[in-house]
């Protein structure tokens, strides 16, 4: 008798992706983040759907509707904080997932990597638009500052900004369209995830050694389904500790003040996961230059396959590259810290140095160090 799992047109797709998928036998816990990102996306879509049932995208009632969700809707506070902190967990997993890709040379899967970078951009856009929806002070001023960056584009900039706003300032039209986009983009993300997986399964997974592992593959189920469940439990535990004990830990107190176009908050800053890019943006005195640096700080990820000059794929056996990688991580943490600080004397200089270092490590130091390691192989 034929196995339905292997013959049914629909079930066999799931089978080839999650059950009988040949997987390297030595992949570590760093490979758990793909499935955790899938879980985060499901959590965000579900909690977001229930929030959308009670939210109103009108400037007069948006803030009140959030209050209504937290006070009057059954477990509304839980859904709201799971959604807000779920975004933070999403970005933690994203950064670790990208970091894993950089460390182990997964970027040599060109299509998978580039779709991953597109996914990162779309997730960042979605998170930004979601932050505008509660219509607090930081929502309003964050939307004003970030959308205003597009006015730096020569010739069409101002027209483009007013077109996005739907008027001459961030107002009702802006909020309504941001809600529409924020609702639809996660489904586009889900579609892109399918393409991401499609390309990944063409080549198979990378592994910590960076070597071809065709001779030593094991089925995904039960080995990695069990392993993923551990990650799932840890993620849910971390999320629920955050939600139930300190739900506002990562938020901004300014967002509990309703949006007021007449008073600017003392320090306009985005959510923590955008601070590194925000620091790079602020460190350049020129508006257009800052915007280009901001975009390039993420877009630079697409250059990694081209900048890979090492004879080895993974950094597992490359101690000098490992040092450079951890310098880069430390630099990103420094940028994140600077992004949350006011624009004052020591922070401006630190931000500028950290921004220069970020691009120098990626474009110059990593390739040079890789070439040195290639030479050392011959000794």
UniProtKB/Swiss-Prot annotation:
Recorded GO MF terms: metal ion binding; ubiquinol-cytochrome-c reductase activity
One Gene Ontology biological process: mitochondrial electron transport, ubiquinol to cytochrome c
Pfam families: Cytochrom_B_C, Cytochrome_B
GO cellular component, one term: respiratory chain complex III
Transmembrane regions: 33-53, 77-98, 113-133, 178-198, 226-246, 288-308, 320-340, 347-367
Binding site for heme b b562: 83, 182
Topology versus the membrane: Multi-pass membrane protein
Family to which the UniProt record says this protein belongs: Belongs to the cytochrome b family.
Any further remark recorded for this protein: Heme 1 (or BL or b562) is low-potential and absorbs at about 562 nm, and heme 2 (or BH or b566) is high-potential and absorbs at about 566 nm.
Name listed for the protein in its UniProt record: Cytochrome b
Annotated organism of origin: Cynomys parvidens (Utah prairie dog)
